[in-house]
């Protein structure tokens, strides 16, 4: 039984692949070796290739797609250039605005500094004027240990119309004429006192 099956298998012919269709193979081979010109003239394509209507439509669609891709690429490049130009213009404008803000800030600081300096000067002038207004002047006409001598000089000065006073400090009795708002008034009184004695102008 086993020998019969083996003989039957040997009797069957080996499997042979069918021959490839000659017509289809020739068409594919022709397409593989054929140079396909792609230009803008469908008539040229038809003349050189002798394509079927379906193949011609495919090639025309490829050309259209390529044109559309080129146009899209050109538009993208143009848009990129415009964006770069706008960005550069905005950057330049921002720099100008920043410089203007800096100049404005420096100007404001300078004005504030000038105002502060002016206020300081005014305050200094007021202080000087206040010091001048608060300072009094007088005459020192003599200093005596003897009270009677001081009173004698006081009386003679009063006779000239001066407000002579005696100020006692320890053992000294000082005869002074006071007080005057300005140094000029004290100098005038000094001239009047010369008929009695020499006095010196002092601050009080």
Curated annotation (Swiss-Prot):
Domain of life of the source: Bacteria
Biased composition (Polar residues): 1-10
Molecular-function GO terms, alphabetical: peptidoglycan binding
Residue ranges annotated for the SPOR domain, each copy included: 131-204
Region (Disordered): 1-20, 70-99
Gene3D superfamilies: Sporulation related repeat
Pfam family, one: SPOR
PROSITE patterns, sorted: SPOR (PS51724)
Family: To E.coli FtsN repeat regions.
Record PANTHER family: CELL DIVISION PROTEIN DEDD-RELATED (PTHR38687), CELL DIVISION PROTEIN FTSN (PTHR38687:SF2)
Name of the protein: Uncharacterized protein HI_0896
Annotated source species: Haemophilus influenzae (strain ATCC 51907 / DSM 11121 / KW20 / Rd)
């Amino acid at each position: 039984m086993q020998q019969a099956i083996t003989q039957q298998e040997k009797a069957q012919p080996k499997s042979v692949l069918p021959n490839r269709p000659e017509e289809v193979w020739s068409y594919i081979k022709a397409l593989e070796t054929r140079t396909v010109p792609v230009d803008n003239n469908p008539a040229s394509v038809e003349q050189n290739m002798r394509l079927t209507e379906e193949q011609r439509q495919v090639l025309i669609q490829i050309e259209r797609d390529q044109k559309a891709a080129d146009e899209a690429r050109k538009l993208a490049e143009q848009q990129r250039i415009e964006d770069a130009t706008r960005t550069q213009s905005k950057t330049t404008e921002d720099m100008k605005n920043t410089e203007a803000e800096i100049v404005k800030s420096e100007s404001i600081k300078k004005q504030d500094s000038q105002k502060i300096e002016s206020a300081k000067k005014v305050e200094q002038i007021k202080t000087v004027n206040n010091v001048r207004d608060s300072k009094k002047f007088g005459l020192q006409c003599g200093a005596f240990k003897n009270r009677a001598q001081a009173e004698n000089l006081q009386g003679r000065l009063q006779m000239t119309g001066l407000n002579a006073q005696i100020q006692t400090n320890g053992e000294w009795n000082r005869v002074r004429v006071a007080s005057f708002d300005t140094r000029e008034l004290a100098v005038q009184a000094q001239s009047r006192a010369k008929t009695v004695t020499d006095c010196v102008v002092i601050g009080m």
